[in-house]
Design a protein with these regions (language model features):
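Bacterial N-terminal signal peptides
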Residues: 7-16
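Positively charged n-region of N-terminal signal peptides that target proteins for export
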Residues: 1-5
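Short linear sequence motifs
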Residues: 6-7, 29
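Surface-exposed, polar/charged interaction patches used for macromolecular assembly or partner binding
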Residues: 19-290
């Protein structure tokens, strides 16, 4: 069952990667830090953002369902609100899993506690201003834009430096710092690897800052996943041997499987770019601040 679910999720994951940011080479991108697309197309979790400015339509609206790089869209702000030619805006939309099928026991509860999830649609630049509306061209695209998307003043996002990848410690001791979980990720996927952008339930209110690193780990013998698991498989497996005594997840070493860097932060959640993974990472895996 788990393999089937993982396969389906992996297909969705690669589809999302294919349709993500059209412009990967941008000013400021470098091999020693996340590139422009990784930072600006990562999505975020925060309190509800102002939503009074919207994409209301665009050119060829009788033909176009969505808008993408180079298209012209119309926003409901014009000269009367101080909009000027050259103004740049970010375009986002609320993001919610339409299925709401939990991958692990506490997933839906944690999602609600973290805040409002937003997907990055891209950026637009104003090219023409009229009294009550403006025309803007899609200058950078993370995917597609659609009528009703939220338009916000553009704020540059920092690209924090990577640490030395060779410093990863597969047997790292417990840091003693805050522990959380990978709750979900972009496009509501549940299976991740290197360069995936995931959401964890610690944010600025818990002293998380952009550039911090999270270590990813899991325990043996946990039964929190929705997918069926065999009870006590960590120390006994019928027909293939058993330990001499019972060992729960508390009795066995944790398994460190990766790490990632914080590229966006909200009050109670952070967006983390996975920089190293020794095997598949799942929603429900644990993280700790390094």
């Amino acid at each position: 069952m788990r393999a089937t679910l993982a396969g389906l999720t992996l297909s969705l994951f690669f589809a999302a990667v294919t349709t993500s940011a059209q412009e990967s080479a941008q000013p400021g991108s470098a091999t020693n830090s996340p590139d422009y697309s990784a930072v600006n197309c990562s999505g975020f979790v925060s309190d509800k953002v102002p939503d009074d400015i919207r994409v209301i339509s665009g050119e060829q609206s009788n033909l176009k369902i969505t808008f993408s790089h180079g298209d012209y869209v119309y926003i409901n702000r014009g000269r009367d609100k101080g909009v000027q030619v050259g103004d740049r805006f970010s375009v986002v939309r609320p993001d919610k899993d339409p299925l709401e099928v939990p991958w692990f026991k506490w997933q839906n509860k944690l999602i609600k506690a973290m805040g409002q999830f937003y997907a990055d649609a891209g950026q637009v630049r104003v090219v023409n201003v009229q009294p009550n509306v403006s025309i803007a061209q899609v200058a950078f695209s993370c995917g597609y834009m659609q009528r009703g998307d939220i338009v916000r003043p553009y704020v540059e996002r920092p690209s924090p430096p990577f640490k030395d990848a060779s410093a990863f410690d597969h047997f790292a001791p417990v840091s003693g710092k805050r522990v959380a979980m990978i709750v979900t990720a972009m496009d509501n996927t549940q299976l991740y690897g290197k360069n995936s952008r995931v959401y964890v339930n610690l944010g600025s209110n818990q002293s998380v800052r952009i550039g911090d690193y999270f270590r990813i780990f899991r325990y043996q013998g946990t039964l929190a996943e929705t997918a069926p698991q065999t009870k006590n498989y960590q120390y006994e497996l019928y027909g293939f041997g058993s330990a001499h005594a019972k060992y729960t997840w508390k009795d066995l070493p944790r398994e460190v499987i990766g790490e990632g860097i914080v590229i966006n932060e909200g009050p109670n959640a952070s967006t983390v770019l996975i920089t190293h993974s020794s095997l598949e990472v799942y929603a429900g895996d644990y993280v700790e601040l390094e």
